[in-house]
């Protein structure tokens, strides 16, 4: 599954204890991952690091943090494709993520192949959307 692509940039909102494993799982793809721990870091990193093709975020955050993070991610230009990860995925979660513009839901723990495939599909979708947007200008 380790198919290399031109520098796919990922913005990952994942707990510190998950970051090393995720970096290891995605290393064969040659991606660049910027980890953030809160929405303040998102503002700072997005301004200084350019655009991202993929954003990875959890399905649940305390105190409506998910909606705060979601609203900030959707304001990035160009908007990255959002992969939401969860311990379990119901139809309600999956359809809710798609309804608000997310790309997909992936269930953790995910295998190397699952996370690599999800990232590559999201990055392809991002590139197609950007190409279509340029064609419509």
List the model feature ranges, each with a label:
Residues 16-37:
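Two-component/phosphorelay signaling modules centered on CheY-like receiver
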Residues 68, 86-104:
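Alpha4 helix (beta4-alpha4-beta5 surface) of REC/receiver domains from two-component response regulators
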Residues 19, 43, 52-79:
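Conserved phosphotransfer microenvironments
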Residues 2, 7, 124-137:
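CheY-like receiver
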Residues 17, 61, 88-92:
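Conserved phosphotransfer active-site motifs of two-component signaling proteins
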Residues 110-119:
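C-terminal output helix
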Residues 39-45:
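Short alpha-helical segment
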């Amino acid at each position: 599954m380790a198919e290399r692509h031109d520098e796919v940039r990922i913005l990952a909102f994942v707990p510190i204890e998950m970051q090393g494993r995720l970096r290891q799982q995605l290393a064969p793809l040659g991606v660049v991952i910027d980890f953030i721990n809160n929405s303040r870091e998102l503002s700072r990193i997005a301004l200084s690091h350019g655009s991202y093709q993929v954003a990875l975020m959890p399905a649940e955050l305390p105190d409506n943090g998910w909606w705060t993070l979601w609203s900030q991610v959707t304001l990035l230009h160009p908007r990255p494709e959002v992969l939401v990860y969860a311990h379990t995925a119901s139809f309600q979660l999956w359809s809710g993520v798609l309804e608000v513009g997310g790309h997909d839901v992936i269930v953790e723990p995910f295998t190397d192949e699952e996370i690599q495939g999800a990232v590559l599909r999201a990055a392809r979708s991002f590139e197609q959307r950007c190409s279509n947007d340029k064609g419509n200008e």
